[in-house]
């Protein structure tokens, strides 16, 4: 049994390991966010130390991004679905696929260790110098976090190479690029973004490592360096990264909406592909909107403001194409479409607050307040996570050959929906009132909305626990699929449930 999983080269086994690893990390990240919300639930201290609070915030961000969203979306669903949707026997480099996965547990181990050694890495996920320099953060904590990022980055780069090669070279006969399912397209564009942005992060954190340990001064003004250089390098990675987190979600939502409306492709399929490509391209030329407060001149700010707003155009194309796909069709209201509808609505809300923050003059006031926290949590906690939840419920019968209790999953959707909105909507008010991020305490003027926000986080926690219970009961009761009534909107629904160890034993020909 151990060799089957340890040395596996089967894309389904590796995808399953990614999903389990992501779920485990997600619980870790969720418990950290609960600590954060309990600390902020009332004025005064609970944890009692700002450094530890910031260590928790930093670890929460890294775990949710690198060990929950990316492994589940790209590693889990990408590995499971891309070869099947292409009609390919497996990934292009199966053993490299195995290595991509096994780089992640040591990486997580290093990150957790960084919190346990000395006073931890309380730098925020951006790891800006001079706070992350050896003066403000002496000891090996930040170095361990840097090594952790190196490993996670290497894992993602290898995975990206694997996906690009697979998608370009291993499609079925008759499947042109244009005929590929949108989820495959989203993974391809995500992989290209990973391949182009992660080396820049690796360079930036390596320079930080040498600044801390080998007496260089890339980011130290006293030696002729500049901390703003680090910010440029970091955000040149950091902005494409947020699109890496959401693009596979776009693909999954497209598949879910098509399936539940009984269509084989969404409205404006080619437009959807071009929109994703445009989002990927534009994601690289807007990075400095994270840095409006560092003293860039007015022309630079004008450019980054307008470029950022242009990203709203392809995003709007996607939103309206989803609405057009839904419009007038006979919608099958199972739980996965509820997650998809929630995604479309809440992602739009998150996008609108993003348009607000794109204005450099407004951003100077709102920068580093809870308005920004509310914005990116609407996009991630209700974009990426809703995509993941919808995908789990949508493809669960295909992965395991078991049914989920449809009524309970609908209740779980409602609980989570109420929870996340109650958590993050009040944070817009806090941000507009001027409450800054990354502080463990606040004036009692902010008590009301913080209390409501923390209440919402408890409801979200109940929703996640309920999801675990639903999946657990489905597995122990072995609710087998006796009769397949799935819509053949995509190839994966034409296989067995679950698929055999080798999905296809011959080359396929796709006829449209």
From Swiss-Prot:
Gene3D superfamilies: Cytochrome c oxidase-like, subunit I domain. Mg(2+) binds at residues 367-368. One of its GO terms (molecular function) is cytochrome-c oxidase activity. Its main location: mitochondrion. O2 binds at residue 243. Signal peptide: none annotated. Pathway: Energy metabolism; oxidative phosphorylation. It is found in: Mitochondrion inner membrane. Cu cation binds at residues 239, 289-290. It comes from the Eukaryota. GO terms for cellular component: mitochondrial inner membrane; respiratory chain complex IV. Its EC number is 7.1.1.9. Heme a3 binds at residue 375. Fe(II)-heme a binds at residues 60, 377. Its cofactor is heme; Cu cation. The chain crosses the membrane at residues 16-36, 55-75, 101-121, 144-164, 182-202, 233-253, 267-287, 304-324, 337-357, 382-402, 413-433, 456-476. There is a cross-link at residues 239-243 (1'-histidyl-3'-tyrosine (His-Tyr)). Ca(2+) binds at residues 39, 44. Binds 2 heme A groups non-covalently per subunit. It is a multi-pass membrane protein. Component of the cytochrome c oxidase (complex IV, CIV), a multisubunit enzyme composed of a catalytic core of 3 subunits and several supernumerary subunits. The complex exists as a monomer or a dimer and forms supercomplexes (SCs) in the inner mitochondrial membrane with ubiquinol-cytochrome c oxidoreductase (cytochrome b-c1 complex, complex III, CIII). PANTHER family: CYTOCHROME C OXIDASE SUBUNIT 1. Belongs to the heme-copper respiratory oxidase family. Component of the cytochrome c oxidase, the last enzyme in the mitochondrial electron transport chain which drives oxidative phosphorylation. The respiratory chain contains 3 multisubunit complexes succinate dehydrogenase (complex II, CII), ubiquinol-cytochrome c oxidoreductase (cytochrome b-c1 complex, complex III, CIII) and cytochrome c oxidase (complex IV, CIV), that cooperate to transfer electrons derived from NADH and succinate to molecular oxygen, creating an electrochemical gradient over the inner membrane that drives transmembrane transport and the ATP synthase. This is Cytochrome c oxidase subunit 1.
């Amino acid at each position: 049994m151990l060799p089957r999983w340890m040395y596996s080269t089967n894309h389904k086994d590796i995808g399953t390991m990614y999903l389990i690893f992501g779920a485990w990390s997600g619980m870790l990240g969720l418990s950290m966010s609960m600590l954060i919300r309990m600390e902020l639930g009332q004025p005064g201290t609970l944890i009692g130390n700002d450094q530890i609070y910031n260590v928790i915030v930093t670890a929460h961000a890294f775990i949710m991004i690198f060990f929950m969203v990316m492994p589940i979306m790209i590693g889990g669903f990408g590995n499971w679905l891309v070869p099947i949707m292409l009609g390919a026997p497996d990934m292009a480099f199966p053993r490299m696929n195995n290595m991509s996965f096994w780089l992640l547990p040591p990486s997580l181990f290093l990150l957790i260790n960084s919190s346990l050694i000395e006073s931890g890495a309380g730098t925020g996920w951006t790891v800006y110098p001079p706070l992350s320099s050896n003066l403000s953060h002496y000891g090996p904590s930040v170095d361990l976090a840097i090594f952790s990022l190196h490993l996670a980055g290497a894992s993602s780069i290898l995975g990206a190479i694997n996906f690009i090669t697979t998608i370009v070279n291993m499609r079925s006969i008759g499947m042109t690029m244009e005929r590929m399912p949108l989820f495959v397209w989203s993974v391809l564009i995500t992989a290209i973004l990973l391949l182009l942005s992660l080396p820049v992060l690796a360079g930036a954190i390596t320079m930080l490592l040498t600044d801390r340990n080998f007496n260089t001064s890339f980011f130290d003004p006293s030696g002729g360096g500049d901390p703003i250089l680090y910010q440029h390098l970091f955000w040149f990675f950091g902005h494409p990264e947020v699109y890496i987190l959401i693009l596979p979600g776009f693909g999954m939502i497209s598949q879910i909406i098509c399936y539940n409306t009984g269509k084989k492709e969404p409205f404006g399929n080619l437009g959807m592909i071009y929109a994703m490509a445009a989002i990927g391209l534009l994601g690289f030329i807007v990075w400095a909107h994270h840095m409006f407060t560092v003293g860039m001149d007015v022309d630079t700010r004008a450019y980054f403001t307008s470029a950022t707003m242009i990203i709203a155009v392809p995003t709007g194309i996607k939103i309206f194409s989803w609405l057009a796909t839904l419009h007038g069709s006979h919608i099958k209201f199972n739980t996965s479409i509820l997650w998809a509808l929630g995604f479309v609505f809440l992602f739009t809300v998150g996008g609108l607050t993003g348009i607000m923050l794109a204005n450099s003059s407004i951003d100077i006031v709102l920068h580093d307040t809870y308005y920004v926290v509310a914005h990116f949590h609407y996009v991630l906690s209700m974009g990426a996570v809703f995509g993941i939840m919808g995908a789990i419920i949508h493809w669960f019968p295909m992965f395991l050959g078991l049914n989920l209790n449809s009524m309970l999953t609908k209740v779980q959707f409602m609980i989570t929906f109420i929870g996340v909105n109650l958590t993050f909507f009040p944070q817009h008010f806090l941000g507009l009132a001027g409450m800054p991020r990354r502080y463990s305490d606040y004036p009692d003027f902010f008590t009301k909305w913080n209390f409501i926000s923390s209440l919402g986080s408890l409801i979200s926690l109940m929703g996640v626990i309920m999801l675990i219970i639903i999946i657990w009961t489905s597995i122990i009761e072995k609710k087998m699929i006796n009769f397949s009534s799935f819509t053949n909107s995509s190839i994966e629904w034409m296989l067995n449930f679950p698929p055999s160890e080798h999905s296809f034993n011959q080359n396929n020909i796709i006829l449209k």
